């Protein structure tokens, strides 16, 4: 997401509407299972009980829990990983080659192996964890809001692909075969350079994904179909890997209708999308949460209780191993 800084503050997730929608139980498994629901809650890193709260309020446990880490330290933090795993979810780490302290990690230097020692240490930590984990390295590369973004610091699609392949190669040599690589550009609706130029190839990727947000800038609202439709078909052309929406959110205005249309009508038509992770936080002054109002939360709950959103961690991991549909 543009301009996001990872936070460890306790999230306000669901507190305003919990009293009203309160003690609903977890949805029972349904017969048709195709799409996994994932959660990003900034509190989950330090307070894994927020994942339990998500399940109680939404009515379905998340199959993916999303975390964000920069290159200041090894991202495979046992408390985070177990916090997700013990609750039936696979952890997904967005691994950002930048630093809170301003240290630079240029793509060209990554590709040449300058940071291999750090990458190897991270790969060993992943291998020691041993269980499957989704890893998003250097996401939204087709935009210009991250240091590895297109056109910044001499970055090119060629350099990006070389850096991606270098990192994956190091992990494979270490034996971190439990890592599933998730390549995630921003949608071509707003992403700047067409993302297909940055794709490193199916040999180097386990999942392909998209990030996209209905910010409401300029007073204009974009539907799910407008945000993701064209980019979905481009992904389908360049890769045979399973797809996910790795970040999604929408502004407050019209949120209830937007969520209902997206999850009930528009997303199910994009049949290769097997997971959706809602970015349940704010950014750039926009409240992107699905629970920003009781109406929006009600729409989200009603949509994801449908059996099509019942994919589990087990089905996800089988999917990303053998590339079959659900």
Describe each region flagged by the PLM:
Residues 60-70, 195-222, 244, 279-281:
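Aromatic- and acid-rich polysaccharide-binding/catalytic face
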């Amino acid at each position: 997401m543009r301009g996001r800084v990872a936070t460890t503050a306790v999230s306000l997730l669901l507190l305003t509407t919990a009293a009203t929608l309160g003690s609903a139980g977890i949805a029972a498994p349904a017969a048709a299972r195709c799409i996994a629901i994932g959660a990003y809650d900034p509190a989950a890193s330090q307070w894994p009980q927020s994942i339990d709260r998500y399940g109680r309020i939404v009515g379905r446990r998340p199959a993916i829990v999303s975390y964000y880490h920069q290159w200041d330290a090894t991202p495979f933090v046992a408390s985070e990983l177990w916090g997700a795993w013990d609750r039936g979810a696979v952890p997904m780490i967005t691994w950002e080659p930048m630093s809170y302290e301003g240290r630079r990690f240029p793509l060209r230097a990554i590709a040449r192996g300058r940071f291999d020692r750090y990458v190897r240490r991270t790969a060993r930590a992943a291998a020691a964890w041993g269980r499957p984990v989704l890893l998003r390295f250097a996401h939204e590369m087709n935009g210009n809001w991250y240091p590895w973004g297109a056109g910044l610091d001499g970055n090119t699609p060629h350099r990006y692909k070389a850096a991606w392949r270098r990192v994956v190669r190091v992990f494979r040599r270490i034996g971190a075969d439990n890592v599933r690589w998730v390549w995630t550009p921003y949608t071509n609706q707003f992403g700047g350079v067409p993302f297909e130029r940055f794709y490193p190839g199916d040999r180097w990727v386990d999942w392909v994904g998209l990030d996209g947000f209905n910010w409401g800038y300029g007073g204009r609202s974009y539907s799910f179909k407008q945000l993701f439709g064209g980019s979905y078909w481009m992904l389908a052309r360049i890769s045979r890997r399973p797809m996910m929406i790795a970040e999604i959110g929408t502004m407050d205005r019209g949120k209830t209708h937007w969520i209902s249309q997206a999850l009930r009508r528009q997303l199910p038509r994009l049949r290769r999308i097997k997971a959706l992770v809602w970015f349940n936080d704010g950014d750039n002054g926009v409240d992107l949460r699905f629970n920003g109002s009781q109406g929006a939360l009600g729409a989200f709950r009603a949509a994801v209780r449908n059996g099509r959103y019942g994919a589990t961690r087990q089905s996800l991991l089988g999917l990303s191993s053998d590339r079959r549909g659900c």
